[in-house]
Amino acid sequence: MTAGQPQVAPQEAASRSDLSSSDLLRVENLTKAFSGVEVLKNLTLGIRPGEILGVIGENGAGKSTFMKLISGVYSPTGGRILFDGEPVRIANPLIAQRLGIAMIPQEFNLINPLRVYENIFLGRELRRGGMLDRSRMIAEARRHFATLATDVAPDALVGDLSVAEKQMVEIAKAMSQESRVLILDEPTTVLSGAEIDALFAIMRDFAAKGGAVLFVSHKLAEVREICDRVLVLRD
């Protein structure tokens, strides 16, 4: 389906006066079509350092497509993406990661036969003296899980984890990348109340330190609680 003209509304309950006037991430006339059918059309918006932007809309309105375009999963059909004011071509997720864009997807991007810490640091393994520093990676993973108020075992096999635990691994992986833009696609669906509270605290801290957060959700109460502005995508 083609997304209609987006609306960006300020949140009455949450606003920060110290947001920068310059966009950290901006898209202009961003369009994506599959087999000639436009699922996102001429989307233009920016997100500033220190801001949490909510993204809502009906199924098929283009929410996940938008997230995948700026995280390198999809390439746009038209329009452009700017990062720190410079046009960028995010051809794959590795480029997004190098720019400082991390995404926590709905579909887990984990390797079940590997251990939790191996998934978190896959492709970014910590080393000491040229050798893999397993103990440090486990310690770092444990630190991230403590921040998330969860007790996932860093040396457990991912294939043995519950759905909620796998979600926490994805979040810990994004946290470990020292990113500047954090994208969360329906992250709270399988989380407990305590885990959601911990996640929201991390999002607020990330934004307070100058990062930008895009939060996709169909739960309006959560959007009102955590977001500064809301992007509404319509069919």
For each feature predicted by the language model, list its residue ranges:
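Glycine-rich phosphate-binding loops of nucleotide-dependent enzymes
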Residues: 2-235
